[in-house]
């Protein structure tokens, strides 16, 4: 939980969108639809 918040604050929105696009598919399968 805390890591997610820190990542959102540190990572800019542009990079965050790219990360979600790449990792989002993997994380969705792992955590069942929960984003970064």
Curated annotation (Swiss-Prot):
Intracellular or extracellular location(s): Virion; Host cytoplasm
Main location: virion
Origin superkingdom: Viruses
GO molecular function terms noted in the UniProt entry: DNA binding
Summary of the function given for this chain in its UniProt record: Mediates ssDNA packaging into virion, it locates to the internal surface of the capsid. Additionally, plays a role in viral attachment to the host cell.
Similarity section: Belongs to the microviridae J protein family.
One Gene Ontology cellular component annotation held by this UniProt entry: host cell cytoplasm
Keyword terms of this UniProt record: Capsid protein, DNA-binding, Host cytoplasm, Virion
Name assigned to this protein: DNA binding protein ORF8
Keyword Disulfide bond: no
């Amino acid at each position: 939980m805390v890591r997610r918040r820190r990542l959102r604050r540190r990572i800019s929105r542009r990079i965050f969108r790219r990360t979600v696009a790449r990792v989002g598919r993997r994380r969705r399968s792992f955590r069942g639809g929960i984003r970064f």
